[in-house]
Structure formats: C-alpha cells, structure tokens
From Swiss-Prot:
Subunit structure: Interacts with TAL1; this interaction inhibits TAL1 occupancy of the DCSTAMP promoter, leading to the activation of the DCSTAMP promoter by the transcription factor MITF.
This protein's UniProt keywords: Activator, Differentiation, Osteogenesis, Repressor, Transcription, Transcription regulation
Biased composition (Pro residues): 15-24
Biological source species: Homo sapiens (Human)
Biased composition (Gly residues): 1333-1347
Compositional bias segments (type: Basic residues): 614-637
Name of the protein in question: Protein strawberry notch homolog 2
Positions of the UniProt region annotated as Disordered: 1-24, 174-217, 614-640, 1324-1366
Length: 1366
C-alpha cells in the first residue's frame, strides 16, 4: 500500500502538493456485479493492484496520532463509518468512536469489494469539513497544511486524559487532482452512514426456556452479547419444589442447567461441570445451595463446598436454611481433626487454603486433601462447589491451584459447580475449569495450552466467542443486577502545593538511597543482589503507593461528611491497612505510642534497617547460595574497576518471592524476571559518570580498614534523612480516616488487622486491640457489619479481608436503608478484588442502588493502579460476561495500558529517551525548558529509578530487553511530580498514536459491534447451513445474507422534527438543484456549531455537519416544502444510486457495474453458530485473501426480533469462505456416512424383520454403506438455537434419535451391528448412576450420559410387546 510521509516544518509536518495531473483510475472489472461499487476499502492491502497507472492519489497525514483529545463537546454518539469511503471523499464518521475507532477493520467493511482499495486515508479535524477538496471540486487546493499531532499538554483533568465519547470524530480526507465534473460538484455532502457501532451493553434478562419459579425481586440483566444466543433446550426435571418462592425463577433456571450438564460425561470419562457466572447480588449462594439440595433429594447425601473464608460457613448455613434445607448439616473442615472421617452425611465446608493443609502429628504425615478424598469415597458422585472460584486461579503455578485440579481428577464422577462473579479475569486463569470440556479429547483444543494460545492470539473477540459458546452448550450462565439507578463518578483530586513539595523531596531521597545502596554493595563486594533489589523496589512501590493514597484522604473526608449530611451512609474501600509498621513501632517503644504512625516512613526505615548491604548480609548470602555460571555467549560483566569507581545499578525486578512479608501483609505485586548482569554505570546523582569525583576514585577494599565504618556511616546518614522526612510524611491512612470520621464509635471497620491506633478524649494517642469482650477477633467483622446494617454506625471501611461474600446494600430487611455511597479510596490492583468490593453494596432486594465514587489523584503513579484494574475489568467482562464493555461501564477503561500497545509504546519511549532515536510523537507541550530539557530530564529520571541498559559505542544507552509496563509504571512513582506526569503523558501519547495507526490499518480489535445500530429495517435474505466437526456430536454453522434498509421515511422524519427546538434545527433544501430536484435533509443541533444530519436515503448521517457549511450549501424550509423532495428522494434511492438521481445516468451503471452510492439498501454477510469450531479455518481464509486474520464479531436484531451474533464476512472473502465451508461440510458428511450405516434408498421399501416367538433376530447384519443426503434431523430448525458444544451436546433434536421400529417405518435400513455395539457399550458402562433413572434423568438416564450419548441410535424395545433387552 502506498503511503506518503509528511514533510516537516520545524516540529510540525506539512503536506506536499499532489503531483500535477494525477488521475484517479477506476478499479478493474470483477466477476460478480455485487462486488462493484464506487467505494474503496481503505484499510487493507488489495489482493492485486487497484490502479492501472503509476499515478497515485495523494493522502494527507493523520492529524490525530497523539493522545490528546479535541476540545470537549457533547455530541451524541452515532454510528461510525466503517465502511468504505466513497471516491468523492464522503467519509462517514461517528462521534461515538473517539475511544473506539471501530470500523477500521476489513471485517467491519460493507459489501464493497476488497479489491477496490486505495491507500490508507488520513484525517483532519471535523471543523475543517467545509475546506475538504474533492475530485468534484473545480479548483482543489494545491496543498493542505495540517499538524501531524495535536500537541500534548500537562495534566488537565480526568476527562482530558484520553478521548471522550462526546468529541466529534476526525474525518477522512483525500486530496485528488482529476478532471472536474461540475454537475456533481457537491457530491461530497453525501455522507455514507456507518453500519457498525456500539449500542446498549445490557439487555433485560428473563429465562427463555425455563418457565418455573417466581420472578426475581430485582431487575436482572445480561450482556447484550450473551443475550443474542439462546441456552439449550431443557431436558432435566427438578425434584425441587418450584412454587415455594424460596428460589426465584432465575435461580431455578441455573440449578436446572447445572444438573442437566451433570448428566453429561466428557470424552475423558469425567463428568461435565457447570460455571455459574452470576454477578454479585443475584444470589449465587442460594443457587449453589439449591444444587446441593437437588442432589440430596436424588440420594446423593454428601457434598463439598469450598470458599475463601471460614466465616462464610455461616452464610452457607443461612443459604441452606433460606431454601428450607434445614436437614442438611454443614461441617467445618477446620474443626475436624486430621484423619477423622466419621462424619457421614451433609456438606463439608472448607477453604481453598485448607486443601494444602498438612499435619505431622503422631509421627504420621496426613493431608487435608487425603482426608477429603477418604470422606468422599472412590465412587463419589456428589456435588463439589468451588465458590468464589477465582481464588483458585493460577492453578498451574500455585500449590493451592494444583490441589484444586488434583481433587477434580481423583473424583472424576463428582458433580462440579464453579461459582464466581469474576470467573477468570484472563484466559490463562481458566486452567482450573477442567470440567467445562472446552479443551481436551474430542474438542477443538487438545489441551489447555493449545486453547490458551488460540484465544490469546486472536484477542478479545475470541474470548467473547468462548463465553457465547459456553452458554449455547449449556455449561455457563451469567446474569447480574441491573445497574440502572447506580451512578458512577470519578473524583479527580489535585495535589496541594505542600504535599507536592513533600512528594518531590521523597523522590529525590529515594534516588539518593538507590545510589547509597549501590555504593555500600560495591564497597563490601556483595555479589548476589537479586534479593537486595527485589526488597528495594518492592519497598519503593509501597512507599509511593501510600503517598498516592494519603493525597486523597482530606478530600474523601469532605465528601463523606457531605454525603452523611444528605442522609446517606458511606462505604469506603481500601486494600492495605499498614498494620505491619504500627506493630514495628510498638515493638521499638515497648508497646507504647505517642502519635499516629506513618506507614510510608515505616516502609523506608524497615528497608534500610533490614536490607541495607552489610558484611553480615554478605555472609548470610554466601553461605546459602552459589553464584550462577554465566551462560555461554554472554558478554563480560562491567569491569571491576568501573564498578568500584562508580555506582552500578543492576536492572532487577520490582519485587521478589523473598520480599519481606513484614512490610505490608495486605500488599501483593508480581515478581519480574531478573537480568543479573545488566548494569548501568551511574554517578552519585544517578547520571552516567563522565567526571568522577574524588570519592569515586578511592580504591575500596572490602577487607581494608575503614570500609565497614564508611558503610555504617552511609546507613546512619540515610536513616537520619528518612526520619527527618518522616516528620512531614502523612500518617497511616486507615487510622486517620477513622479518627476524622468520628472514631471507632461511629465507624465500622471490616478489615483483616487485629489492632488500631486511636485518639483518646484527653488528646493522647494509644494502640488498642480490635477484639471485643466475649468475641474472638474472627467474629469482630461480623459484629461490625451488623452495627452498620442496623444504623448504629453510618460509615463502613472495608478491605479485601471483608470484600468476599459480605452484603452491605440498602437491604429491605434491615433498619439502615439509607442510600449507600461507595467510595474507592484505593483502587484494588486486581479486578477480582475490585468486582468483589463493588458488589458489596449493589445486591438483590435493595431499597436503592448505590453511588460509586472513584478517587484518583493526578499522580501518574496513581494511574498505574487504575490501569491494572482497567485491564482486568476489560478482560474480565469479555470472558465471564461475554462482553468486555460490561465492565468498561465502570469508567476505568481510560487507564488501560497493560496490553500489546502499551508494550510497544514503552519500547518506543525508552528507545527515544535512552538511545536518542526518532519518534513521531511530540513531547508534552509546555514542559519547562522545552524539548532538549525534557529529554535530558527524562533520561536522568529513568536512570535514577533503575531503568536503563548497557552503554553502546555511540554513547547512547541500550534499552533494557525485559522492561515491562508494570516495572515502568512502578518505577516512575519515584520521579518528581512534574517529571512523572510529563513522562506518563509522553508514554500515553505514544500509546494512542500506535492505536490510531492500527485502527486506520484495520488491525485494532474493537470487540463485538452492532450491525446497523439504530436501524430497525434489517432482514435475513438467505441462509446456508453447514456441518462443523466436533466430538461427540458435530456442530453447525449458518451463513446469512443480511439486508439493511437505512432510509428514513417522511413520517418518521416529520415526527422527529416536531421535537426539535434549536434556532437552526429543521428541514433544509440545497441551493444546488440536481435532477430537477434539490437535496433535502433534516438538521438537529448537537452542541456548539455542529449538527446531526438526517437524509431520506441514508437515515442518520454519521458525519457531523458544521453550521457554516450547512448554511453555505442549504437554506431552511418548512415541513410542507420539504415533504415532496423528501418522499421523492426516499422512493428513488431504493433502486437508483445518487449519480442516477442527480444526472439521470451513472458512469458505472453504463459500464454494466453495480453502483451503491446513496442507495438505501445494503447487504452484509455473517457466519453464526458453533464459531469456535471453524474459527481457525475462517481466520486462515481471511489471512489469505486480505493479509489479516482478524475476525470482526458483530451482532444484530432483525425486523422480526431475531438476534444473531457471528463473524462479519467481507464481500471480497465471501466466495472463498463459502468454498471452505462446503469442503468442511462434505468432510463431516463423509465421516458420518459409514458411522450411520443408514443409506437412503430411492423409494421406501418395507423391512421384513423376524419378530415372532422363537424367531432369531440377526443383530450382526450390516447393510452396505452408501452415500446419502443428511437425514431430516440434520436440518437447522432455528438460527443459533444450537445445542452444539465442545463434546457434550447432540446435533439433532430428541425426536431425531428414533428407535429402530420408527426408522423401519421411514423405509431406512438399520445398521444392527451399530445397535449391538451401542448395547455392549451400555453394558460395560456399569449400572445406572444413583437417581439417574428417576424423574427428569432424561432418556437413557444412565451414567453414560443420558440423552447426550454419542451413539446415533439409542436402543429401545423395537417391537410391540417385546421386552427391553437386559
């Protein structure tokens, strides 16, 4: 693809004039008339040259490649222009896509041919629309000057940080010099409407196939993606009473599908499991209790229930009691001695940590896992519940996770239920869900690693398909409470000047500490420094994290008091408590305190006191470890002389598995890989040493006189400086909050700490235990919760210790029914924790929905924590709710940097700063000292926080290979405020630039989009059904041709005009008369000087129109004057393109080609059904045709209310995709033919079977196999009503699995050999499972899988009066 780089005028690019006489050539003729159109797909490489000459159209440069948004406006979201821009530069646009430049995928294209391609267009601001030169202009401008980037600026508030939905999009621009055609001069106004966009994230949820139970007490929703696919038909009948009201219709539906899935055996021989992904507050506890009760009624009296805390045992008992299952006892494993298995029946309740418990008592090695297995027995078929199952994530890397897998493998027939609102936040965390049957024998993925690779390679779209496929297959259900009534807001908190001064001093002191630690390590000759630097950077991160939190305390207290004054109550979310430092100070002062403790100061002091390099530390390390041998081929380390004459900062991880647990028990961070031998030679201020001072020239002998004294003096000097700084550092956030909001008497604390510091009435400060008389510390949180719910206390502070399973909503059953205001002071570093905290105050049966307030400071370091949450939320929503935008609605997605774009942006930034390479992204505007100062300061700053590499021959620093986003964002916490904000801004500008590039090239994954949002006239023109391979049953995919009528009738336009009130709103007619008629439109003012335009042929134009452009080309008229041209244009555009309407002829039509310019009707192609099974095939075809394997997932709702979700197939790929599907279908049918052994004769003929008494029935007879068309049960009764899942669901309907007699009446030979083999398999499968033959077990009902069995023909008594065999 051609691309013209911008010419540069100092720091700003300018466009060069187009070559004189350049002409635009039409595309070569194609075979199918459908593929012809006057549009170009601008986002992918053509399969063959699109031009027949060397002359090329000139493309302007992009004007939005930086991260800064256009001025904030509030344009209503409209559909975007994915489709291919017309040759006249009429580029459809959409203001709703400033964050999501969706449609730039080739799979977001319209029906236009992929062969009609020109270079990627570039963009200019929307307010320049009236200046756009087109091929129809008489005098196109010779050149256009446009900035390559909108310059960045320092922090200016949250909304300015990333693009806003309410900002008008930039429009595509293309400057051409061709022979003018005056009669079509104004064709540029004909904006093509976009076919793809985002609509509502949620849809109201009502059980579609389960009709039992009473309505849920609150409104429940499902993501619109999951709501687009149906669940399987119900074949299981519950033994539970359905009319008692103890379980709602939603909960009974989940119980039904779980028990139905438990009737299925996977190809591995294990029983299939079920995932309950319901959000917090829907009632997962009662649902799980219902599954246990159902199995109890079926005779399975034992069950295992795993959760995160022993306290939740009381919630389990409450749930069983609420559903009237009082006869089921709950036994706490923690109260049972090792080796005791005397408990006979009931629920064994245990925590995940108990799974790895061991005991050596009595000289015998006992484990809890062995105890559980002994209690269950080898043939255990009861229920195993993994409640809050996200705690078992990382099963491949943690002992606890491996125990969860081991338990499932050793009890293969157990009925497993996974239950969690968060499920798995990343595909790799699904490893413990081995019973879902998504990977393994007989599935598209042989093992979990193959599944993981496929999903991560294909991005969020594949994750969304997984969720839909799981629901269709009957193994997954995910509903959540409606968020209607819930308000979200982000409170951006500016830093006080005094606080900023303290922060800057702390940053400088940490940079000095880095140098001091390095000097001390060099002086004593410390070799192994991995643990040292792990401790250093872990403490570094904690210290600045505490400062970030402390910056928000004052504002939070103000907000809390305001909300209390409005008769509301406040819930404050924290993650860490800082208790460890408090206990250290107590120990140092013999249990006495005279002031509040600073957690930040404690972290710094503890690091120096415990981990400062010393000879003792060297001896300890040397005695227990050996130096690793350098791998062959590695370069030599920095010379000893260099290391001795300057500080050597080794690039190391930010945390370590050996990190000090005493620093903060509530904090976690991920270990990073260590490159021991990467060194940066720095001087005392963190810069590369060129002029080394006298101190550095001293030869240091670790065993010589004075070395130990100098090291000790360095340590004491550093301690003194930290203590001086500590006088100004903020005190422990949790203690200060409780003190400011009224003390323990008015604040309910639900955290994991055992003591706190409080103010006494006389003004003194004292430490007190949280334990109360008659209560153990374990029960204090429950008592505090009761006080809050009763209204005794109106402020609650919760941490992770209380964020699972605790209900703090405005419940109708409690006294305190004030509206909850949930303030997140400290964003959890994990989305798992975030979702749990958000769900504490938004639950069923509440009087009012909560308000959420997220407090975020302007520190770049604070955004680091927000970015992690945003990443987890985005991925989480995609995987567990089928739609990543479900969690994006929590307003945190603006901070998502931890992805491939973040990695690329980071590499680009580091190479630019350290290696002095060129970067097209400008530095933040307004940085003191300008560009040279910016790069000098950033280089010094990066080195002062340990980010850098080896010095190359040209004097530049090589970029560290393994510097991750996490490390980068952790480390820049330690820069002065203005530096970290500038560096963070530069990073985010580069990040957005890379995303924009991918959007324009069609490589950006937008998730699931809506086809023709806001348009109701959508119809299915045709469908073709194909079989897809699977095990034990084959699936189906359906290829649809969709028609979209985007026109706007006069009646609808007139009704809309009646609601308009703006001074310039209303109908307009063009000054230019075309085809003896003026063009007509309806304009609606948005905000400022921009209007949304509606036209009779295309409906809402996604490009916003500027007021001056509107008034220059149109004049306002009354509705009566507009009616006739509107109706005429609407009728004519059904069959005639714009050229025919304007000029009474069309050049393309005269050449025998199809022209779609301005037509009302559009065609699209979709592939729906068992998409996971054909994903790889379709991606390969796409890559072959279009050089990109990205698949765009779309959804739509037709005129007759049918919903479809599937892969959008571009017009240019249709022929190849259909060819591949036909080959696949033929392969499946060939494989099925000998298995069925059931040839279809040309005419029905009776089958004479000996059936009298004493007659012998030859069950070994097998008629010869013949090719035959698929029997009726292979038809596709309803689109997407698929029961096809990976290895668990039959292809046909139950009616299709007829008995031999029924087949005989159909005139079809029976393969009795197959029937006999099926009988033998049933015999070898053993006796029916307990209760399986009871009501609702389904046909067959045996352990072999009931109605889901693999055999094509199920054996039943074939003759009247005959006895069932065996």
């Amino acid at each position: 693809m051609l691309a013209v780089g911008p010419a540069m005028d100092r720091d700003y690019p300018q466009h060069e004039p187009p070559p004189a006489g350049s002409l635009l050539y039409s595309p070569p003729p194609l075979q199918s008339a459908m593929l012809h159109c006057p549009y170009w797909n601008t986002f992918s490489l053509p399969p063959y040259p699109a031009f027949s000459s060397d002359s090329r159209p000139f493309m302007s440069s992009a004007s939005f490649l930086g991260s800064q948004p256009c001025p904030d406006t509030s344009y209503a979201p409209v559909a975007t222009a994915s489709s291919l821009p017309p040759k006249t530069c009429d580029f459809a646009q959409d203001s709703s896509y400033f964050e999501d430049f969706s449609n730039i995928s080739i799979f977001s294209s319209s029906v236009d041919s992929l062969s009609d391609i020109v270079d990627t267009p570039d963009f200019l601001p929307a307010d320049s629309l009236n200046q756009v030169s087109t091929i129809w202009d008489d005098n196109p401008a010779p050149s256009t000057h446009d900035k390559l980037f909108q310059l960045s600026r320092p922090f200016a508030g949250f909304e300015d940080f990333l693009p806003s939905h309410s900002t008008p999009l930039l429009v595509s621009y293309q400057e051409q010099s061709v022979q003018s055609q005056p009669e079509e001069e104004d064709e540029a106004e004909e904006e093509e409407a976009e076919e793809l966009g985002h609509t509502e994230t949620y849809a109201d949820y009502v059980p579609s196939k389960s009709k039992i139970g009473k309505q849920h007490p609150d409104r429940v929703v499902e993501t619109s993606t999951l709501s687009s696919v149906p669940p399987p038909d119900i074949t299981y009948t519950l033994a539970l009473p359905s009319d008692s009201g103890a379980l709602s219709a939603l909960q009974l539906e989940a119980i039904t599908y779980a028990c139905q899935q438990h009737e299925v055996l996977l190809p591995s021989g294990q029983r299939a499991g079920f995932l309950i992904g319901d959000g917090a507050g829907v009632g997962k506890g009662r649902t799980v209790a219902g599954v246990i009760l159902e199995n109890h009624l079926r005779g399975r009296k034992k069950a295992l229930w795993f959760s995160v805390s022993n306290d939740l045992k009381y919630d389990a008992e409450r749930d069983l009691r609420d559903i009237e299952a009082t006869g089921i006892a709950v036994h706490a494993l923690s109260k049972i001695k090792y080796g005791d298995t005397t408990t006979s029946e009931g629920v064994l309740f245990a925590t995940y940590s108990a799974l790895i418990g061991e005991s050596q008592a009595g000289g015998q090695h006992r484990t809890r896992l062995r105890q559980i297995l002994d209690w269950c027995g080898e043939a255990f078929e009861g229920v195993i519940v993994f409640d809050e199952c996200h705690k078992a994530k990382n099963a491949g890397s943690t002992k606890m996770g491996k125990a969860v897998l081991d338990l499932q493998n050793k009890l293969p027939l157990a009925r497993v239920v996974y239950a969690s609102a968060t499920g798995a936040s990343e595909p790799r965390n699904m490893i413990y869900m081995s019973r879902l049957g998504i990977w393994g024998e007989g599935t598209p993925f042989r093992n979990f690693e193959e599944f993981l690779h496929a999903i991560e390679k294909r991005g969020v779209g594949a994750m969304e398909i997984v969720a839909m496929d799981m629901k269709v297959s009957g193994m997954y259900i995910a509903r959540q409470l409606s968020f209607s009534g819930v308000t979200f807001r982000i409170e951006e908190i500016p830093l006080a000047p005094a606080f900023e001064c303290v922060y800057n001093r702390a940053a400088l002191l940490w940079a000095e500490a880095l140098n001091v630690f390095q000097q001390a390590a060099d002086w004593i000759g410390l070799e192994s420094r991995k643990s040292l630097w792990g401790q250093f950077w872990s403490a570094h991160q904690r210290f600045f994290k505490y400062l970030c939190i402390a910056a928000k305390v004052r504002r939070l207290v103000e907000l809390a008091r305001e909300e209390l004054a409005r008769d509301k109550c406040v819930v404050i979310g924290l993650q860490s408590t800082g208790e460890a430092r408090t206990r250290e100070v107590l120990g140092e002062n013999d249990g006495h305190l005279n002031c509040f403790v600073s957690a930040a100061e404690g972290v710094f002091l503890s690091l120096i006191q415990k981990h400062f390099p010393s000879t003792k530390r060297k001896r300890d390390r040397g005695a227990g470890s050996k130096r690793k041998r350098r791998p062959r081929g590695r370069g030599a380390k920095a010379p000893r002389l260099a290391c001795e004459t300057a500080g050597v900062i080794r690039i190391s991880d930010d945390s370590s598995t050996e990190s000090d647990p005493g620093l903060d028990s509530d904090f976690n961070s991920s270990p990073e890989s260590l490159v021991d031998d990467d060194v940066v030679i720095v001087d005392a201020v963190g810069l590369p040493s060129d002029d080394r001072g006298p101190l550095c020239l001293l030869q240091r002998d670790p065993h010589g006189p004075g070395v130990l004294e100098r090291v000790e003096r360095l340590k004491q000097d550093l301690l003194d400086k930290v203590r001086r700084l500590g006088r100004e550092l903020p005190v422990n956030t949790l203690d200060e909050l409780i003190d400011q909001l009224g003390g323990p008497q008015r604040v309910a604390e639900m955290t994991g700490r055992k003591g706190r510091v409080v103010s006494r009435p006389d003004g003194t400060v004292a430490f007190e235990s949280r334990a109360e008389q008659g209560l153990s510390i374990d029960h204090v949180n429950l008592r505090e919760k009761q006080r809050f719910m009763s209204g005794e206390k109106l402020v609650a502070i919760i941490s992770e210790a209380s964020s699972s399973g605790v209900s703090l909503q405005a419940d109708r059953r409690v006294q305190n029914q004030r509206r909850r205001v949930h303030m997140t002071l400290e964003l959890p570093w994990s989305a798992d924790r975030a979702i749990q905290q958000f769900g504490r105050t938004h639950r069923s049966n509440q009087v009012s929905a909560p308000e959420y307030v997220f407090l975020i400071s302007e520190l770049a370091g604070e955004r680091r924590f927000a970015s992690i949450v945003a990443k987890r939320l985005e991925s989480l929503g995609a995987l567990t709710h089928g739609d990543r935008r479900a969690t994006e609605s929590r307003d945190l997605s603006k901070y998502n940097f931890e992805n491939k774009y973040g990695t690329r942006a980071l590499h680009c930034v580091l190479t630019t700063i350290l290696s002095q390479t060129e970067n097209k992204v400008p530095v933040p505007q307004g940085y003191p000292g300008g560009v040279p100062t910016f790069f000098r300061d950033m280089k010094q700053g990066l080195l002062s926080v340990g980010i850098g590499g080896r010095e190359s021959r040209n004097g530049c620093l090589d970029v560290e290979k393994d510097c991750s986003i996490t490390k980068f964002l952790n480390r820049i916490l330690g820069l002065e405020v203005h530096k970290q904000n500038a560096l963070f801004q530069y990073f985010s500008d580069t990040f957005d630039h890379l995303i924009e590039m991918d959007k324009r090239e069609g490589k950006y994954d937008m998730g699931i989009l809506d086809l023709a949002p806001g348009i109701e006239e959508i119809y299915e023109e045709s469908q073709q059904v194909f079989l897809a391979p699977g095990h034990p049953q084959d699936g189906q995919v359906v290829f649809y041709k969709i028609s979209v009528d985007r026109g706007l009738k006069w009646e609808d336009a007139f009704a809309k005009s009646l609601a308009l009130t703006g001074p310039y709103d209303g109908f307009y007619l063009s000054y230019k008369v075309r085809g003896n008629k003026p063009s007509c439109l309806l304009a609606e003012q948005n905000r400022g000087q921009f209007f949304t335009v509606y036209k009779p042929n295309i409906g809402r134009q996604s490009q916003l129109e500027a007021l001056d452009s509107l008034r220059r080309k149109f004049h306002r008229v009354t509705a009566e004057e507009a009616k006739e041209p509107w109706e005429s244009g609407y009728a004519l555009s059904l069959t005639h393109c714009s050229h025919s309407a304007w000029n009474r002829h069309c050049r393309l039509a005269q050449e025998g080609k199809d022209c779609l310019q301005g037509l009302r009707l559009r065609h699209h192609y979709m592939l729906c059904g068992a998409l996971l099974r054909v994903w790889g095939r379709i991606a390969a075809v796409m890559a072959d045709v279009s050089s990109s394997s990205y698949l765009q997932i779309v959804r739509l709702k037709t005129k007759d209310r049918k919903k479809q979700v599937g892969i959008k197939i571009p017009e240019g790929c249709v022929r190849r995709v259909l060819q591949e599907l036909r080959l696949m279908d033929a392969d499946v049918k060939r494989r099925q033919a000998p298995a069925l052994g059931c040839p279809a004769p040309p005419a029905p003929r009776p089958l004479a079977l000996p059936c009298g008494p004493g007659e012998v029935l030859d069950l070994t007879y097998s008629p010869p196999a013949e090719a035959f068309p698929p029997p009726p049960h292979f038809s596709f009764p309803a689109p997407l009503s698929l029961d096809a899942g990976p290895g668990v669901v039959p292809l046909g309907t139950p009616d299709a699995q007829a008995d031999p007699a029924a087949l005989a009446h159909q005139g079809c030979d029976i393969n009795f050999k197959e029937v006999l083999e099926d009988m033998l398999r049933s015999l070898h499968a053993g006796p029916p499972s307990e209760g399986a033959l009871g009501e609702g077990a389904g046909a067959g009902g045996a352990a072999g899988g009931g109605p889901e069995r693999q055999s094509v023909i199920q054996f039943s008594p074939p003759f009247p009066g005959a006895q069932a065999p065996l």
